[in-house]
């Protein structure tokens, strides 16, 4: 029976005192042996953490004492082992970085679509479906018929919209992401740019996989997640991908058979682009990981997925 609860959570809400929230939140999580990363900004909170059931319940109760965070959106999955190495609470300009001034999902946002209604929406031939995630996420799984903006970071999405989508031509646009935060900000951006009918999947892919039976799914593949599981399948169990710790790209068993794969160092995606200094640094890091593993200790510097959510 899984012992660890993994909670992905976020909320867009005005937090003018966000800097003062950091230290008490960090201390609470450490005291309760919760690990992961939380981002605080004036626009809200975002992150993924993991701990025992009672610890995560205590964290939700902690948020509940602040009226602004009492109804924080959170989704859970479960694992046998802690997927994170440490606890970090970071201060940021944005909780998900788009880099466009004046976007505020607290004031304007697209229409939320419940997971049970998502299939009907994306089956509509008039609806353009846009995956707001990045290439490495799209490559391992997405919804049937979804457009890939071919982005390497969320910052590139506005440029994709400017070049490829037109409010006068694309009357209905549906957007989705892993947990809901990127598509919420994306639809706020779209509304600001004059798109009228803009929809986004409430709770993101993870909520869809949780609530929609696999026999009814429009999802194809696995879903990239930002912890050491790398990806999850439709049952929200650890999928078949591992992570290249050189470039943070998800890799398959086939990739590992390549002559360009070096465990913990490089893979076919990054082998030919690494500098000698990078290669040496990654080799030394992997050596330390192996030494820690031999001593049955967690290597505190062991890399975990850190790409933009």
Curated annotation (Swiss-Prot):
The gene is trhO. SMART domains: RHOD. Pfam families: Rhodanese, UPF0176_N. Its EC number is 1.14.-.-. It catalyses: uridine(34) in tRNA + AH2 + O2 = 5-hydroxyuridine(34) in tRNA + A + H2O. Catalyzes oxygen-dependent 5-hydroxyuridine (ho5U) modification at position 34 in tRNAs. InterPro entries: Rhodanese-like_dom, Rhodanese-like_dom_sf, TrhO, TRHO_N. GO terms for biological process: tRNA modification. This is tRNA uridine(34) hydroxylase. Keywords: Oxidoreductase, tRNA processing. The lineage of its organism: Bacteria, Pseudomonadati, Pseudomonadota, Gammaproteobacteria, Cellvibrionales. Residues 123-217 form the Rhodanese domain. It comes from the Bacteria. Belongs to the TrhO family.
């Amino acid at each position: 029976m899984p012992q660890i609860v993994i909670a992905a959570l976020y909320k867009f809400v005005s937090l003018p005192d966000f800097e003062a929230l950091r230290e008490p939140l960090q201390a609470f999580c450490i005291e309760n042996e919760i690990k992961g990363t939380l981002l605080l900004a004036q626009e809200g909170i975002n992150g993924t953490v993991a701990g025992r059931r009672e610890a995560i319940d205590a964290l939700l109760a902690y948020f509940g004492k602040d009226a602004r965070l009492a109804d924080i959106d959170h989704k859970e999955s479960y694992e046998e082992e802690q997927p994170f190495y440490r606890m970090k609470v970071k201060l940021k300009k944005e909780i998900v970085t788009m880099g466009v001034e004046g976007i505020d999902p607290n004031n304007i946002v697209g229409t939320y679509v419940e997971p049970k209604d998502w299939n009907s929406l994306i089956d509509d031939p008039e609806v353009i479906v846009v995956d707001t995630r990045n290439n490495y996420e799209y490559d391992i799984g997405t919804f049937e018929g979804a457009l890939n903006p071919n982005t390497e970071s969320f910052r590139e999405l506005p440029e994709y919209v400017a070049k490829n989508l037109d409010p006068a031509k694309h009357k209905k646009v549906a957007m989705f992401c892993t947990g809901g935060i990127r598509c919420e900000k994306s639809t706020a951006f779209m509304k600001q740019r004059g798109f009228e009918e803009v929809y986004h999947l409430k709770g993101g892919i993870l909520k869809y996989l949780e609530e929609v039976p696999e026999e009814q799914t429009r999802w194809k593949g696995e879903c990239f997640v930002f912890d050491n599981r790398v990806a999850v399948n439709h049952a929200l169990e650890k999928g078949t991908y591992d992570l290249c710790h050189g470039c943070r790209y998800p890799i398959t068993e086939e990739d590992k058979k390549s002559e360009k794969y070096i465990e913990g160092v490089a893979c076919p995606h990054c082998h030919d682009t690494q500098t000698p200094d990078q290669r040496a640094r990654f080799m030394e890091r992997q050596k330390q990981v192996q030494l820690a593993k031999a001593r049955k200790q967690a290597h505190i510097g062991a890399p975990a997925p850190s790409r933009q959510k």
